[in-house]
Amino acid sequence: METQQGFTLIELMIVIAIIAILSAIGLPAYQNYLQKAALTDMLQTAMPFKTAVELCAIEHGGAANCSEGSNGVPAGKGSRYVSAVTVKSGMLTLSGQESLNGLTVMMIPQWDGLEGQMSWQRSCSTSQSSLKEACENVFRFDDSDEVAE
């Protein structure tokens, strides 16, 4: 008599169930990782504009004259996850795209003329609470306060 080789239906169903459980655990973690990577790209896109606004504010005694395309502030250019960057009177506004679609980040400079220092407030606006929380964690500066919405 020949012996049968292979897997039984029950064994295959158990393997499929294990794979489904591992996928259910791994997929959200992977999606969070991708979201944080996209937010990091957004932060890296904002940094040259932030630095330019700070230098402009030092040179001109405030951020009122620091808009894109003037006084050393570059013209707005997006990236993979940033559809638009605008700088007006020192305030940076970044609009997300792809996995950050619907996210708007505002970075508002707070100029202290007596000390000659600048601090930043940030505001993350989106309808997704998890994306807003991740944005607030990525765009966290030591001197930042969240803007009241």
Task: Show where each model-derived region lies.
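N-terminal single-pass transmembrane signal-anchor helix
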Residues: 1-41, 45
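A general marker of short, structured functional hotspots
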Residues: 3, 26-29, 45, 52, ...
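Conserved hydrophobic/amphipathic alpha-helical signal-anchor segments
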Residues: 24, 32-74
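Periplasmic/extracellular, small/polar-rich flexible segments of pilin-like filament-forming proteins
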Residues: 57-149
